[in-house]
A protein has these predicted regions:
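Glycine-rich, basic loop-to-helix element that forms the pyrophosphate-binding segment
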Residues: 66-83
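Conserved nucleotide-sugar donor-binding catalytic segment
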Residues: 143-220
Length: 262
């Protein structure tokens, strides 16, 4: 198995079908990849709805795991624990990908190189929303294989990329954090990453923006508390391992910025 695609989902709506349909349409041989869908914090009627949809519409290899414990980080951890692929791809359940997404990523990924795709933001009201990672892609993609920290903005989360299992090892998402755990996870595995390389423009991760999503419902007091804990954890990791100093500084600045703008 070359790739395991991990999708956490909680009380999914119709957008999950769009996500799964986009994977069903992948050009990469279906024998080379699997989907691990983790339904977290809920059960019925969503579990039966997913099972019925998969049976009626999909031919790809897909396993469904249900856990009563809610939380995207816990769901991703469960997905990794049950994944069979040499590479891991994370996709959020309200996003979707272009047909060549997996094939383009696997062609350029390596044991020390993260493969990253083009990305486009959208919403239910707008087909195209300006997105800072689209700008980052446009400015970095043509440079070819490059040190990972050259494209530091792409390391704010695990989506839009293909990650070798050896980079992850036993590392998992820290479930103690309500926000910022995506960036913390990417920092934690960065000692195993040397390079990043981008796909062509046709391999696209479509990022949906929704009002009231988990990353948006956040008070200032919570932001301050969570931000302080993140800074402490980043610093602990930095002094514990051989992390890039420049990359560490950018993560701390990112946390401070998120506190100020909250």
């Amino acid at each position: 198995m070359s790739i395991s695609v991990i999708i956490p989902t909680y009380k999914p709506q119709d957008y999950l079908w769009q996500c799964l349909d986009s994977l069903e349409a992948q050009t990469l041989d279906k024998r080379l990849w699997e989907v691990v869908l983790v339904l977290n914090g809920c059960s019925e009627p969503w579990l039966t709805e997913i099972q019925d949809y998969v049976k009626a519409h999909l031919t790809m290899r897909l396993s469904i795991i249900q856990t009563d414990t809610a939380g995207v980080s816990n769901a991703r951890n469960i997905g990794m624990d049950n994944a069979a692929g040499e590479y891991i791809a994370f996709i959020d359940d309200d996003d979707y990908v272009s047909p060549s997404y997996l094939e383009a990523l696997i062609q350029i990924a390596d044991i020390d190189t993260i493969a990253a795709s083009n990305t486009i933001g959208f919403s239910d009201e707008q087909a195209h929303i300006p997105y800072y990672l689209e700008k980052e892609y446009n400015s970095k993609a043509k440079a070819g294989k490059q040190p990972f920290y050259n494209a530091k903005k792409y390391f704010g989360g695990p989506c839009m990329k293909l990650i070798h299992r050896d980079m992850i090892g036993e590392q998992r998402f820290d479930t103690r954090f309500r926000n910022g755990e995506d960036s913390l996870f990417m920092f934690a595995i960065s000692t195993k990453i040397r390079y990043i390389r981008f796909t062509d423009t046709n391999a696209i991760y479509y990022r949906r923006f929704r009002i009231g999503s988990a990353s948006k419902t956040y008070t200032r007091k919570q932001a301050l508390h969570n931000g302080w804990k993140l800074i402490c954890q980043y610093t602990h990791l930095f002094h514990k391992g051989k992390y890039n100093r420049y990359f560490y500084k950018t993560r701390i600045l990112g946390v401070l910025h998120s506190i100020l703008v909250n």
